[in-house]
Amino acid sequence: MIFDKSLLGFIGICCLPPILLLIYLPNVSLQWIIVQSGFFSFGAGLLTYKLIPSVADLTSQANLTGMDLNKKGDPKFSGKKIPESLGICVAVVYLVCVILFQTFQWFSFPETIQLSEYNAALTSICFMILLGFGDDVLNLRWRYKLILPMFASLPLLVAYAGGTTVVVPDINFPVPLREWLGVVFDLGIFYRIYLLMLAIFCTNSINILAGINGLEVGQSVVIATSIIIHNLIELTIASSVPSSSSFSSSALSSVSPHLFSLILMIPFLFTTISLLFYNWYPSRVFVGDTYTYFSGMCFAVVAILCHFSKTLLLFFIPQILNFLYSVPQLFGIIPCPRHRVPKFNPETGKMEAIPTNLTIINLLLMITGPLTERQLCVYLLIFQGLCSCVGFGIRYHHLHHNPTLIFI
């Protein structure tokens, strides 16, 4: 296989910062656990890469195939059927990897394992994999896609052991919020409702921002990388505390959530990168709703159980903007076609915007003019990465003034 240079560059840029942060992590014990998780994840990535062609043959035999709408009229690709629902391969390998490492962790580092969180995470992820594959096969209606994730999220709310308070912004316009509510305000049951809505948003937002070869998987790689970087930064700060040099109870309380998040996100990143090799332009497989729901729930799981749900939203800035821009169509205010992708011009070989399809994909084309599908995907992923940088700036801009804000 000949790898695209832009793809290799993208993967290299995503992988380099976490590797550097891991090298400089002060706590050797944590470092060793993460490295071991990396070995398991690397094996899962290789297995995914090897299995995808075989699973693609199986989905083709089951008539789970589709046409690439962005290549109509292109003599190289026109009429070619592409295997769909390859997210099922990634999801199954991911689950096997996490379960195997959970077993390994139980025997090697029993003091670091979080069984209730593991079980809740795997239950919710499995539910969404089932829903996604069911959608690929049965073509479920949107109302089911909004309702069923609520039930998938219930194990997360049961296992959630974090607080329900928020820091009130120091804003005096239009009203002095802190004078009315105080510095910290307890939302109670409304915070859990917010977590429920977060899970529904995550599972659907990646599915909404889709339709370009490599986009669904590429944005998941960027978000997963951002989460891993965030976790490593938090572990580095927590490890600078003298008591965190070993696995004391006080040290574990600060590092366990982020260690748990890394154990879930590292195999996700490796298996997703393997899928990206096949889904990059020109795509040889389609990921299906199985992958988009699986990836969205993975992000929701770590954000909720590891207590950084507000930080996760900073990494979802493009998805939030796309949702807000799409609201008139999503809620039926104006007609919403089944596929809101741009149109392909076979004469120029470029994608052109359809202004009535309200997505940031079409909005970008309206700003830049026609682009090739590869260029369009690269620009959108660059935007995703820049938004993550903005998110890190917002998240950590107070760190040099007050290091305790890092744990909010």
Swiss-Prot record:
Any one Gene Ontology cellular component term annotated for this protein: endoplasmic reticulum membrane
Alphabetical list of InterPro entries matching this protein: Glycosyl_transferase_4, GPT
Subcellular location: Endoplasmic reticulum membrane
Annotated Pfam families: Glycos_transf_4
Pathway where this protein functions: Protein modification; protein glycosylation
The family this protein is said to belong to: Belongs to the glycosyltransferase 4 family.
Function: UDP-N-acetylglucosamine--dolichyl-phosphate N-acetylglucosaminephosphotransferase that operates in the biosynthetic pathway of dolichol-linked oligosaccharides, the glycan precursors employed in protein asparagine (N)-glycosylation. The assembly of dolichol-linked oligosaccharides begins on the cytosolic side of the endoplasmic reticulum membrane and finishes in its lumen. The sequential addition of sugars to dolichol pyrophosphate produces dolichol-linked oligosaccharides containing fourteen sugars, including two GlcNAcs, nine mannoses and three glucoses.
Self-association state and partner proteins as the record states: Homodimer.
Name used for this protein in its record: UDP-N-acetylglucosamine--dolichyl-phosphate N-acetylglucosaminephosphotransferase
